[in-house]
Amino acid sequence: MGSQLALKSRIASTASLEKIFNAQEMIASSHIAKARDVALNAKPYTDAIFDAVQALVAHTHIDHPIVKKNEDNPRVAVLALTSDRGMAGPYTSSIIRETESLLARLDEQGKQPELYVYGRRGVTYYKYRNRPVAGTWEGDTDQPGVEVAESISKALLDAYMKPADQGGVSELYIVFTEFVNMVVQKVRVLRMLPVELVLPEQPESGPVPESDADAATPLYAFEPSVDEVLDAILPKYIQSRIHECLLTAAASETASRQNAMHTATDNARSLIDELTRKLNASRQASITQELTEIIGSADALNKKEE
């Protein structure tokens, strides 16, 4: 009887968890379409600014921090985009693992990485381990707004534009999860600054002419000067790229949460079925034992009467 009571208790608690998992899955399912659309809708704007920056970078004669790497400054900024909430499978752990790998590689190269973290789970992880963090942000990782992108981009741009002797950094990396589809989300490391010129794909045969740098992007006329345009467009470029990373990370987080809750719901239902079979087997064994005892008692009475 004690075994049956324990099984009933486990079935009841598992059924309660199954309802929670199923509700979380349905909530994530209702959010994923919007999160995916928001990320896709932001891409054209980001691509347009990226093309403009590429056109500026194509002017190889310019001397601007956006394209010039300070080899004398070993400090490097690394921004990790984690989540505020759990129940999203390996989402945050994958980001932290890739971030730790990047930090180790930078250390091997003789650089001094400075860590910035977005998301309560990541902040808690590094705080618990007493790891130094240069900047943290929390809130709405599954629905990030423009305000948080502005705050992050301002802090990172300030760090990048500072002189080396004032604690500035020479490079900026972002570790985030790129949304591919509902099943696939890839952890990526993006070096945002300094900007490198991306040339169009060339045929395998024949040399690459120098004029191809001018063909990397559409033609632009810059007024009053390339440097002044760079100064004006740099904050918008950083903010738009960070905002795009936040949005695709939010879509990835929601998809990961839906997949995790779907798996948890299936596992809970399988466990309920297994526990129910054990309970039924225990009941059947109890009934069989009781019948055996009754029949044995009846036989004993009959023998006494004889």
UniProtKB/Swiss-Prot annotation:
It comes from the Bacteria. One of its GO terms (biological process) is proton motive force-driven plasma membrane ATP synthesis. CDD domains: F1-ATPase_gamma. It is a peripheral membrane protein. GO terms for cellular component: plasma membrane; proton-transporting ATP synthase complex. InterPro entries: ATP_synth_F1_ATPase_gsu (IPR035968), ATP_synth_F1_gsu (IPR000131). GO terms for molecular function: ATP binding; proton-transporting ATP synthase activity, rotational mechanism. Keywords: ATP synthesis, Cell membrane, CF(1), Hydrogen ion transport, Ion transport, Membrane, Transport. This is ATP synthase gamma chain.
